[in-house]
Amino acid sequence: METGLRWLLLVAVLKGVQCQSVKESEGGLFKPMDTLTLTCTVSGFSLSSYGVNWVRQAPGKGLEWIGYIGTGTYLANWAKSRSTITSNTNENTVTLKMTSLTGADTATYFCGSGANIENEFFNAIWGPGTLVTVSS
């Protein structure tokens, strides 16, 4: 009986984990000065309760924070002049828009959400990432 309850609990926990997911839309190949639009779709929790972070990782480099949307919208200093982050809580999506792309924007872009309020960045559920290449 005890073993059966343990299995039931394990299945319930795993099912709960599987129900929460975050995924970025497809990236692709862009030309310099193009505009990038990426959408982060979350399921299993509501964006009215949790914020979303965007980060990116250029080839051979570390993670670079782009911005966050939750109770407010915050952007890295380098991104402020050409980036916007908007949220659609009805569709549970967050959109990152970045204009005037250059080769330096070539990176894998990630969004993360679903974390607890106290530590949203580190405890977030992150998407698999999407590769964006900027080249003429």
Swiss-Prot record:
Signal sequence extent: 1-19
PROSITE patterns to which the protein is assigned, alphabetical: IG_LIKE
InterPro entries reported in the protein's UniProt record: Ig-like_dom, Ig-like_dom_sf, Ig-like_fold, Ig_sub, Ig_V-set, IgHV
BP GO terms, sorted: adaptive immune response
Keywords: Adaptive immunity, Immunity, Immunoglobulin, Pyrrolidone carboxylic acid, Signal
GO CC entries: extracellular region; immunoglobulin complex
Record-annotated Ig-like domain positions: 20-127
Statement: the UniProt record of this protein carries the keyword Signal: yes
Designated name of the protein: Ig heavy chain V-A2 region P-MU-3
